[in-house]
Amino acid sequence: MRIPAEAIIADDKLTMYLLAQRQWDDKSGFLRRAGFTLDNWNDLRLAIRELSNSVEAVNDGGNEYGTFYRIDGSLIGPVETLAVTLIWMRRSVDQRFYFVTLKPRKE
């Protein structure tokens, strides 16, 4: 299945989690390699949407909150392309899709 175009990617997920330098589970350094920073955070949103629109999402289990979907693919950044896994959730309460996270893909 494809993640719908109206799926939600919260601003805070990008600016306060993925692109913010953190002591634990830091992803900002990985994303910086591709040219994503807090200065161009919306470019990251667009790249996530582009990947999600071009690759089938695979059911990755679920819990009481919803069903998780995984997308493995190439995230195209301003200076480099990264192999990533995107995680989305279709929430049980409203059936809407929400972006959860991305992580480096082990090849």
Feature roles, as predicted:
Residues 1-70:
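Compact soluble domain cores
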Residues 63-107:
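Short, compact, well-ordered microdomains
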